[in-house]
Amino acid sequence: MLAQATYGYDHQSKTALTDLIGMLLGSVSLQDVQMHTPCVNPPLKATVKRLISEVICRYGVPETIESDRGPHFNGEENNLTVDTNFFLLGFQLSHQLNIFLFCLLLVVYCGTICGNLLIIVLVSTSKSLHTPMYFFLTQLSISDILLPTDIIPNTLYILLNNGASITFICCMNQFYFFAASEEFECFLLTVMSYDRYVAICNPLHYNYIMTSDHCIRMAAMCWVLGFSITLMYCVTISLLTFCGPNIIDHFFCDLVPLIELACSSTLTIELEAYITCFLVLVIPIIIVIISYINIIVTILRFQSNVSRQKAFSTCSSHLIVVSIFYITLLSVYLYPKGGKSLKVNKLLSLLYTVFTPLMNPIIYSLRNSDIKKSLQEFIKKCVICQNGINNL
């Protein structure tokens, strides 16, 4: 609104605007953000900085301010770019709630690492689990270790400091591994649905179709697609101009908060986002739905109740994981912004970045007799080894 009001201003108005911007820049320094000093009113400062950015991006930097921009700015002519730092606001909670959330996330992170490592160890050491379904489960566990490791440590730091600055490179690294893990999981869950479809609907050809080489190629393709598609995002984001204020009202570097800070055109990256959404979300969801429709129809044709229960038990865990993952993901990125607050958005993001990786090994362990049996055998082996060491 400030930019529109000053459209076509004359020399006198320009001088007054210059003085106004000078006073605002003096009172709302970007050093307040970059040096971790607490903001008296962060939303107000963010609004003021955004208004300043709109004016400067549209009309250029006034001459009286040009000489005083200091080391925090670079760029030429009409571009004002904050050098390298962003500021993550986090959850903006009271000190007591921050401590509680810190402890909760720390426990969840430790449980996530231990649970997924246990799945990987069990599948690797138990011959009865050397099947395509459990091979894909180990790949899911690797992704579930990578994602929270990328998000939680920095989130814990933000909770302790009530916000934290992050360099552009670190922000891009965090976004890269976050998005790559999510996209990989979208593709992998689709492959796992196909695996269950072949096992239930075409069991006689299962061993011929789902060979070890075929499984390795499909898993590798999921990793390659996830990391290569995300690289395209990072390249496009690096070409954007950020006029400031570079304040991200989130607990990690996500795509939407990042492009909202850009003062240059975001048409290219928005187009990439729509195309990627179709390739990574829409198509996999359609494949998963079609696969499970065929699976359910096939299972209902079984005459034996025992066969039905066994078939449902092998698919139910995967179906629960798929449902939780896609529901939380779609609620964050496809649900209209006007229908939910920033706090709700952060909560939903917390679910699929932190709690879903914890739930996956629990769901597969509690509802899978093969993993339970392998866990019992693994514990017996550990006890025998410990007794042997003690007897030496």
Give names to the regions the model predicted.
Residues E76-L392:
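Transmembrane helical core of 7TM receptor-like proteins
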Residues M1-E77:
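Retroviral integrase
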